[in-house]
């Protein structure tokens, strides 16, 4: 079985055990990011993105029909600053924030940004493409916000060549993402496309996840 089989489920289970959140495997980071953007209905809305990130982050916003607002980063960790989020929220009608964990560690301002977004009703999404294996006081990436998305591209700490993983504390988003990655199956209520992870890719990921500390 090349797709939708036991290795995809095993990879998701092992990632969930490490990340402490329900997980959905995708064919890329982009697939997971687009699922988040669609689920939170961010089309035509303003989304804050840090200036220091890979093009995938703002492009996911653009492809979802939302508008990109750029925010400055801290010199100390090269990640989005709390001050930039506060300033952008005062200046713009922000609907969401992409918090990118650059360089293998959690963004230093993650707790403050998360609390601010909760108070203001702003969706907080975490780009965890660099954050495999990271934690802060036992808390894993993707758990500060509404969702987190990992990449398993060839340059990542955990690599399967290509691939992604969406994690979230919201059960409804997890179910949405399962349909989104597979043309909306089985009910076709979700307007998804093909973002499935292959069984070969998932097998590589499951083995590596078992070796993570």
Model-found features: residue ranges?
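Hydrophobic/aromatic ligand-binding patch that stacks against planar heteroaromatic rings
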Residues: 59-61, 116, 200
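Active-site phosphate-binding strand-loop segment of PLP-dependent enzymes
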Residues: 77-160, 167
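Aromatic/hydrophobic pocket-lining residues that form π-stacking "cages" and hydrophobic walls in ligand
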Residues: 57, 113, 177
């Amino acid at each position: 079985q090349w797709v939708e089989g036991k290795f995809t489920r095993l990879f998701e289970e092992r990632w969930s055990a490490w990340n402490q959140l329900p997980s959905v495997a995708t064919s890329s980071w982009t697939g997971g990011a687009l699922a988040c953007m669609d689920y939170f209905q961010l089309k035509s809305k303003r989304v804050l993105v840090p200036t220091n990130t890979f093009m995938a982050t703002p492009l996911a916003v653009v492809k979802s029909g939302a508008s990109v607002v750029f925010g400055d980063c801290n010199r100390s960790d090269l990640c989005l600053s709390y001050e930039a989020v506060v300033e952008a929220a005062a200046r713009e009608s922000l609907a969401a924030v992409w918090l990118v964990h650059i360089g293998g560690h959690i963004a230093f301002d993650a707790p403050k940004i998360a609390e601010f977004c909760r108070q203001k009703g702003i969706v907080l999404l975490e780009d965890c493409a660099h954050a495999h294996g990271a934690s802060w006081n036992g808390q894993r990436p993707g758990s500060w916000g509404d969702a987190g998305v990992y990449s398993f591209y060839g340059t990542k700490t955990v690599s399967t060549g290509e691939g992604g993983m969406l994690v979230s504390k919201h059960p409804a988003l997890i179910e949405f993402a399962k349909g989104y990655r597979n043309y909306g199956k089985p009910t076709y209520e979700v307007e998804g496309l093909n973002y499935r992870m292959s069984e070969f890719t998932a097998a590589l990921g499951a083995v590596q996840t078992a070796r993570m500390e």
